[in-house]
Amino acid sequence: MSTHVDRKRITIPQIRSMKGKGSIVSLTAYTTPMAQMMDEFVDLIIVGDSTGMVAYGFNSTMSVTLDMMINHGAAVTRGVSKACVIVDMPFGSFQESPQQAYRNAARVLVETQAQGVKMEGGAELLETVDFLVRRGIPVMPHIGLTPQHANVQGGFKAQIRTEEEINAFIKLGRAFEEAGAFALLVEGAFEEAARKVTAAVTIPTVGIGASPECDGQVLVTEDILGLFSGYTPKFAKRYVDLSQPIKEAFSRYAHEVRSGEFPAMEHCFGVRKNSDGG
């Protein structure tokens, strides 16, 4: 069994200071083993509400609960000794009021030991971000394509196309910076919009389906590992196809159990070895 080693983790101020100094490397994680494996390679781990679709088979993120996010967030921080960890606030846990958002975000930080929260939305969140930051809770607003607003946005479609929309997007990014956000997650925005908002703010932008000009990139880990055999989003890159070796392992295990090959005596307790080592 592995044990967590408490070392110096990357801090929120350090993430903020990485603006313009090389790309911030970020991935999603929902479990301790995955967090342990990626920890040495990434700067920022996002415990995303995408877990609803990745781990639970939901059609969207709307069914994810605060308790689910806390459980996954705590699992991830137990596996991390270097990376900064941010936890998504799920739909319905922060939209009602700044006070509701504070209560739930404070619970997330206390119970998970994560370093900040991520919230999806637009100008309606400005007051909430200011309220939380003033009370010691680091916030990363998630702008552009926001999956929690898929019903309003008409599905998972790229956003911010026109000049008017781009100008409003830049204004929104600056407003979040003024409200105290430490970084912005920019998803599914047209490249020009993502590039221009990155240039317009002094806090880092982390892109997913956005622009190479963002200050960092994040992808869903299961997408880069090829764990979904049927679909890879346009903005994702599959670095390995693990679905096939995993299926092969399942196949070999099933065959050995059915054939009686597994377990062998070497896998059993209380069995003495023969004098010849057999």
From Swiss-Prot:
Gene Ontology cellular-component annotations: cytoplasm
Name the record gives this protein: 3-methyl-2-oxobutanoate hydroxymethyltransferase 1
Cofactor note: Binds 1 Mg(2+) ion per subunit.
Active site per database record: 187
PANTHER family: 3-METHYL-2-OXOBUTANOATE HYDROXYMETHYLTRANSFERASE
Enzyme Commission number(s) of this protein: 2.1.2.11
Functional description taken from the UniProt entry: Catalyzes the reversible reaction in which hydroxymethyl group from 5,10-methylenetetrahydrofolate is transferred onto alpha-ketoisovalerate to form ketopantoate.
Binding site for 3-methyl-2-oxobutanoate: 49-50, 88, 118
Name of the coding gene: panB1
Binding site for Mg(2+): 49, 88, 120
Compartments it resides in: Cytoplasm
